[in-house]
């Protein structure tokens, strides 16, 4: 009897032990297979604006490349898949988080003003906008030296390996992507493209190329092969640069090989702004990080949450405060002048990062949206948008890169170097931003506390100067929770509005990353009028109109955001469907 009882107890204990082991095993497995959802990755991810380029970036990571390696490879690819947005003839900004050192640095390789330029260039803004075609708007390209500096500091794989996938793409029968074809057939762009040297590349007779049409580009393939094997100096001081300078001189360009040789990227610390549990790292002036930081810092103080969006009046209230904050931000863009070229601007953006100004702005935001432009320090300025490309990368070790690259407006200056296969930027067009409509050029570069003196005046370009930019490749880090958000966007002047709204929706309003990027945005122009992306909530639009917000129609919206987030063991990556993007990870 006792023996039978003992056997029963032993069996019960054995069963309990097995059950406990199963539970422990399940817990352990759940940690490795966390409930991340089917769209999550376990290790790393790349978000470029096309599937093929995201895939190339992922492959580089899987070959033990660093996040910088993957970013460069994805950008080189994008210059071929979406050449209307970026390329070797443009410029790039990297924001890089090194998990080993815990530091975030910025490499600014945006284009600069060449030594020879028209002193009265900015008097041509009214005639040039919105496209800015012509060789007079070309800045010194910085793209390749930006890649080289980033690779020198943070690369792991051999330099040439980063170019091989795109060279293979070009040599293997490259075809036109649907997004590129859409730009080629755009009714505004098409006449200028047809009249430019780009016609030889993108037209079949009188017709623009269509999706899946062959796009032979042997000159660019050869250029990439040369840069891969010989390094970037073959462009900046060697035969590639000489060929480019000679080609575009036929279009009226005054760019010289000396301009190329003098170009150097700038390496600086990222701006750092606390946003509750997160810290935002973004690029300093002349990039737009200070404006993005200002917007989010002001909005943080309103303590918006998921509950704020639960009822119609709450949603209207959130977007009213956003609109008013964007108006005040627009009035501060004068602070984005290049501090290297204009020393009095050295500390001009510092106030934008602090709580004192943020609190002052919050106190000036009330329930109405019909204040005079002077309330926000707004002056009617030139604006344009739709260009640029962004890549976000998160590596296995937690290091991250946000990189935004551009030739400025679609197809840049529409000037093509046939021997190198390079499309040139029109970056000097961004200098028009500092010249309010109706202003003339003034020889005085700095007057008092504000650049250019009173509103209505502007000052000529300075050789070596970088244009003010809306580019905001950014990284947000929550060290306590081990969370990150690597984010940036494209779309010219729409970039800051789009990125700010994606961050606001993700951090505070309860949106997941995909929904935060997909949500229709609003934008405030320099007249203080609200522009709504198609499908933006009509209910919110009516509510804002009731509060006195003026609205206007924007002829063309193309705001594009790419982001990667890390939440515990889960990695999420989203490329914006507005540009038919698709992220990749593993």
From Swiss-Prot:
One Gene Ontology biological process: fatty acid metabolic process
Transmembrane segments annotated in the record for this chain: 9-29
GO cellular component: plasma membrane
Tissue specificity comment: Expressed in follicular dendritic cells in lymphoid follicles (at protein level).
Documented EC number(s): 3.4.19.13, 2.3.2.2, 3.4.19.14
GO molecular function: glutathione hydrolase activity; leukotriene C4 gamma-glutamyl transferase activity; leukotriene-C(4) hydrolase; peptidyltransferase activity
Post-translational modification summary for this protein: Cleaved by autocatalysis into a large and a small subunit.
Major localisation: membrane
Family note: Belongs to the gamma-glutamyltransferase family.
Name of the molecule in the record: Glutathione hydrolase 5 proenzyme
């Amino acid at each position: 009897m006792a023996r039978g009882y003992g056997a029963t107890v032993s069996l019960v204990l054995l069963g309990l032990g097995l059950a406990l082991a199963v539970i422990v095993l399940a817990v352990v497995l759940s940690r490795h297979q966390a409930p991340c959802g089917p769209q999550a990755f376990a290790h790393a991810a790349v978000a470029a604006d096309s599937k093929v380029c995201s895939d190339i970036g992922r492959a580089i990571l899987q070959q033990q490349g660093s996040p910088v390696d993957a970013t460069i490879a994805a950008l080189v690819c994008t210059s071929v898949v979406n050449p209307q947005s970026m390329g070797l003839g443009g410029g790039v900004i990297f924001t890089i988080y090194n998990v080993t050192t815990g530091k975030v640095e910025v490499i600014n390789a945006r284009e600069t003003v060449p030594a020879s330029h028209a002193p009265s260039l900015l008097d041509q803004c009214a005639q040039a906008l919105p496209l800015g075609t012509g060789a007079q708007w070309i800045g010194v390209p910085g793209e390749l030296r930006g890649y080289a500096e980033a690779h020198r500091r943070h690369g792991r794989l051999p330099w040439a390996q980063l170019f091989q996938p795109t060279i293979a793409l070009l040599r293997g029968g490259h075809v036109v992507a649907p997004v590129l074809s859409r730009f080629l057939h755009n009714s505004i762009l098409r006449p200028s493209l047809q009249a430019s040297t780009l016609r030889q590349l993108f037209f079949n007779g009188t017709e623009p190329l269509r999706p899946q049409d062959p796009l032979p580009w042997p000159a660019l393939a050869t250029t990439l092969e040369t840069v891969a094997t010989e390094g970037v100096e073959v462009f900046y001081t060697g035969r590639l640069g000489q060929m480019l300078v000679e080609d575009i001189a036929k279009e009226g360009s005054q760019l010289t090989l000396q301009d190329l040789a003098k170009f150097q990227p700038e390496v600086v610390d990222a701006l750092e702004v606390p946003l509750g549990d997160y810290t935002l790292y973004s690029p300093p002036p002349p990039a737009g990080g200070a404006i993005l930081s200002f917007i989010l810092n002001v909005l943080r103080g309103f303590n918006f949450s998921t509950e704020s969006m639960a009822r119609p009046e709450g949603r209207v209230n959130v977007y009213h405060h956003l609109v008013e904050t964007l108006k005040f931000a627009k009035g501060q863009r004068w602070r984005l002048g290049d501090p290297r070229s204009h020393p009095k601007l050295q500390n001009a953006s510092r106030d934008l990062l602090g709580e004192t100004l943020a609190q002052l702005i919050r106190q000036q935001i009330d329930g109405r949206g019909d204040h005079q432009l002077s309330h926000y320090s707004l002056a009617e300025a030139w604006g344009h948008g739709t260009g640029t490309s962004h890549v976000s990368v998160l590596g296995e070790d937690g290091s991250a890169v946000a990189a935004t690259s551009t030739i400025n407006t679609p197809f840049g200056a529409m000037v093509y170097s046939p021997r190198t296969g390079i499309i040139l930027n029109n970056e000097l067009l961004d200098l028009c931003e500092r010249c309010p409509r109706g202003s003339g050029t003034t020889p005085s570069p700095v007057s008092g506390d504000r650049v250019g003196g009173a509103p209505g005046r502007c000052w000529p370009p300075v050789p070596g100067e970088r244009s003010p930019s809306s580019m905001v490749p950014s990284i947000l880090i929550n060290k306590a929770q081990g969370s990150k958000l690597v984010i940036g966007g494209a779309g010219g002047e729409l970039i800051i509005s789009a990125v700010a709204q994606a961050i606001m929706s993700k951090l505070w309003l309860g949106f997941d990353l995909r929904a935060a990027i997909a949500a229709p945005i609003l934008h405030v122009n320099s007249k203080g009028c609200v522009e709504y992306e198609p499908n933006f909530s009509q209910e919110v639009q009516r509510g804002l109109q009731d509060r006195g917000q003026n609205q206007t129609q924007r002829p063309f919206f193309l705001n594009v955001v790419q982001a990667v987030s890390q939440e515990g063991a889960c990695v999420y990556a989203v490329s914006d469907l507005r540009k038919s993007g698709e992220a990749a990870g593993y």
